[in-house]
């Protein structure tokens, strides 16, 4: 399962990051063509990048910590005598969750406060990239975990708590951010383009 996690991160997160960098460069070029009066910087690009990058990394760390914890519980309940859950994995999971959750919660609370105080933040290209990178990573984990879960259901693999833990935790991450994005919408051409890229990429991934 660690190989699956690494493969999903390299196969999903990095391409989305490259796409995001391209979109960000295009947006900056377009802004240079626009009158300065029409630009509302909000909290500023540097601060915005800091908050969203830290939130992204912290949430991924916390979510995978929760996956380790749930995997330990599931294998203890349903693994039987053959499958003995590792306490080392549980310790790692608790450590990741204890570190990641407070960091994400603190930074995300500040991000949401900025959005409330400065409505221009809703149109931020960085915010949309944060949301859709997480949606993309979630879809990658969900697809791979669904395959593993179905293999166990049809008797092709022994029971493992990992697929079910990934399914429940990352489904929650996906649902939260999808609901958030649906409520905010896509107020600019650039943010709509990011949504379209996500939809096309997710559709292609399900076909593959």
Please place each PLM-identified region on the residue numbering.
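Hydrophobic/aromatic interaction determinants used to assemble and anchor large protein complexes
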Residues: 1-208
């Amino acid at each position: 399962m660690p190989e699956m996690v690494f493969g999903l991160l390299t196969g999903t997160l990095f391409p989305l990051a490259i796409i995001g960098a391209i979109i960000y460069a295009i947006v900056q070029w377009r802004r240079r063509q626009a009158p300065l009066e029409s630009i509302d910087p909000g909290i500023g690009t540097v601060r915005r990048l800091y908050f969203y990058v830290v939130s992204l990394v912290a949430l991924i760390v916390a979510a995978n910590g929760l996956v380790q914890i749930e995997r330990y519980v599931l294998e203890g309940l349903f693994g039987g005598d053959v499958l003995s859950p590792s306490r080392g994995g549980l310790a790692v999971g608790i450590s990741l969750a204890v570190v990641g959750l407070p960091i994400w919660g603190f930074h995300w609370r500040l991000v949401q406060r900025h959005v409330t105080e400065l409505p221009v933040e809703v149109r931020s290209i960085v915010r949309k990239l944060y949301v859709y990178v997480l949606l993309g990573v979630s879809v990658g984990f969900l697809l791979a975990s669904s395959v593993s879960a179905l293999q166990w259901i049809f008797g092709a693999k022994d029971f493992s708590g990992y697929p079910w833990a990934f399914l429940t935790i990352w489904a929650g991450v996906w649902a939260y951010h999808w609901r958030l994005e649906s409520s905010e919408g896509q107020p600019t051409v650039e943010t709509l383009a990011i949504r379209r890229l996500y939809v096309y990429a997710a559709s292609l991934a399900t076909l593959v």
